[in-house]
Amino acid sequence: MAISKGNASKEAQEFKRYIGVCPVFVKAVNPNKAEHEELFNTTLEEAPIYVQDKEDAEGNSYKNVRISVVMQPDVEKIGFEMPLVTMPLFVTNQKQHGAKSGKYQVVDKYGRFAWATEAEISAKEIPTYSNGKRADISNDYRIAFVGEEDLTAFIKTFLCIPSITKWDNDERCMVPNNDVKPEDCECRLEVESFEKLFKGDFSEIKEILGFQPNNKVKVCLGVRTDPNSGRLFQSVYTKKFMSNASTNFNSLDKMLQADIAYASENGKVLNTEYSAELVHEYSIIPTSFHTSTEDTNMPFDTPSEDVSDPFA
């Protein structure tokens, strides 16, 4: 008999995943190998890679930078223990360009974004949209990098940087915010800062997110299902960040619902599930199968009771 005795069976190791709005501290940014091992109590075979050379559909090479923000959930606030969560933000040295509109995304020194034509950019004009309204942006803008808007939004929300303008319900438009000083509203990384990122120098972004070490920000956690293996991974929604004081998540919910509607209308499948509820442990709702007592439109005849078993 040539059969191995095998090994003792083991239970599958389960890792909890969480979904919903969660207050977090920033624990680290792009940790090196030693820092990563200490943070996550693990051992890495190689150092993390944060800058990669990529190639687009036209064969043009570009730099893709991953900014990994390691976040510590505020367990005192949420009332239960949670592990560290890593949020990846990606930026590239490509210009943010709208393929259909032909416009470029631009950003001013206050971290406001808009879309402008080449003619508007050349003339340094405030972009005007099809409805006749002018964009809420100053003319000191520059063309934005791909991924810059998400990164800027996180920095601005985490550091509690006020907006230079505010919404006026009577005028139905944005008006100057006279309650703040303009210099306190500045929030834009300059081109030189991005050039450092593309070279793998993250000292400046680490310094910026370290300005307010005790600050918290609320992020939306989700769970991504790998379509091939079915494994579940913790995810973070990077289109919307909320101040720690936020208690109304309606705008987040509208964005999540809009994403679902867009995917449905365009035949896309969303592999990540998010929730605008308060953070809680994620659980899969099992499919309920009901046995019908009636024989209704069955595609095949049901086997008769006297059919013999061919393998008996």
Across the structure, where does each feature detected by a protein language model lie?
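Short beta-rich binding modules
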Residues: 1-312
